[in-house]
Swiss-Prot record:
It comes from Hordeum vulgare (Barley). Residues 23-143 form a propeptide. One of its GO terms (biological process) is proteolysis. The keyword Ribonucleoprotein does not apply. It is found in: Vacuole. This is Thiol protease aleurain. The active site is at C168, H308, N328.
Length: 362
């Protein structure tokens, strides 16, 4: 019992210390806060090694916990998380030996079971009926660029983090709206995901349990607008709607849907219009994506398979493999600075089954 209490205290200290380290990584070694965080990390390391034994792998796990601000309740949980971490590390190593066009890496999800990850980061699968017959008007194909990255145009807002809430659809929605607004006005803006979590249920959305950008665009259109992030900040839990019309910053005039499975339409929209909200099926393994062009023979290709909404901000070719460039909502320390590439041309993981973009008032 005494050992468990020491471990719990050490891990609690770790969570505070890791936050300080994450927010102060550029501090010089002379910073007076540094010795405190180093001592806390040392205490955690000793506690973890005490629970697991002094091995190189246990030390790697302790350093992982420090880096990501982990906090575990008991020695039993440390051992369980260590087992999951070990399995994740083996998956990374075995996948990276296969010569695939992408690579995996250890990240903040590497000590989570697949069931935990699904419950806290993904939404329930929903049928995207709005895309059965799309209304995107194809633009001149001759003007379509060979590659596109809307970040270079300065209209893509920074990567955000949905945290422990299946609200990916709200971040895909606001990402598309923020890009459209900046494109139309030349002004940057951050919009409220929490408003969508709390208020868009009447349009077949379910807060932290999932939703669709196309349905969120319709909600905003009929609601009369969406508040700023500052006026309606993100909490990452389901709450009571307290939208205030006076804080509405962007109005949606209409939404445009890409025809089901039509990657040519999607490429036309991404290349010639602006970033497009898309959804796809996340399967176990993708959560540890690090770089390269993701491809899989195991994910689905129908609207009923999708469980995660994101934002397509461009496309290109890497080592001969065409790809979609996609902004995620799992933080800037995930993947390739918060982004990933998905193979283009095969409706990979149903990426072209649930795509739409908004038209906003300037």
């Amino acid at each position: 019992m005494a050992h468990a209490r020491v471990l719990l205290l050490a891990l609690a200290v770790l969570a505070t210390a890791a936050v300080a380290v994450a927010s102060s990584s550029s501090f010089a070694d002379s910073n007076p806060i540094r010795p405190v965080t180093d001592r806390a990390a040392s205490t955690l390391e000793s506690a973890v090694l005490g629970a697991l034994g002094r091995t190189r792998h246990a030390l790697r796990f302790a350093r992982f916990a420090v880096r990501y601000g982990k906090s575990y309740e008991s020695a039993a949980e440390v051992r369980r998380r260590f087992r999951i971490f070990s399995e994740s590390l083996e998956e990374v190593r075995s996948t990276n030996r296969k010569g695939l066009p992408y690579r995996l890496g250890i990240n903040r999800f590497s000590d989570m079971s697949w069931e935990e990850f699904q419950a806290t980061r993904l939404g329930a699968a929903q049928t995207c009926s709005a895309t059965l017959a799309g209304n995107h008007l194809m633009r001149d194909a001759a003007a379509l660029p060979e590659t596109k990255d809307w970040r270079e145009d300065g209209i893509v807002s920074p990567v955000k983090n949905q945290a422990h809430c299946g609200s990916c659809w709200t971040f895909s929605t606001t990402g598309a709206l923020e890009a459209a607004y900046t494109q139309a006005t030349g002004k940057n803006i951050s919009l409220s995901e929490q408003q969508l979590v709390d208020c868009a249920g009447g349009f077949n959305n379910f807060g932290c349990n999932g939703g669709l950008p196309s349905q969120a665009f319709e909600y905003i259109k009929y609601n009369g607008g969406i508040d700023t992030e500052e006026s309606y900040p993100y909490k990452g839990v389901n709450g009571v709607c307290h939208y205030k019309a006076e804080n509405a910053a962007v109005q949606v005039l209409d939404s445009v849907n890409i025809t089901l499975n039509a990657e040519d339409e999607l490429k036309n929209a991404v290349g010639l219009v602006r970033p497009v909200s898309v959804a796809f099926q996340v399967i176990d393994g993708f959560r540890q994506y690090k770089s390269g062009v993701y491809t899989s023979d195991h994910c689905g290709t129908t609207p009923d398979d999708v469980n995660h909404a994101v934002l397509a901000v461009g496309y290109g070719v890497e080592n001969g493999v065409p790809y979609w460039l996609i902004k995620n909502s799992w933080g800037a320390d995930w993947g390739d600075n918060g982004y990933f590439k998905m193979e283009m041309g095969k409706n990979m993981c149903a990426i072209a089954t649930c795509a739409s973009y908004p038209v906003v008032a300037a």
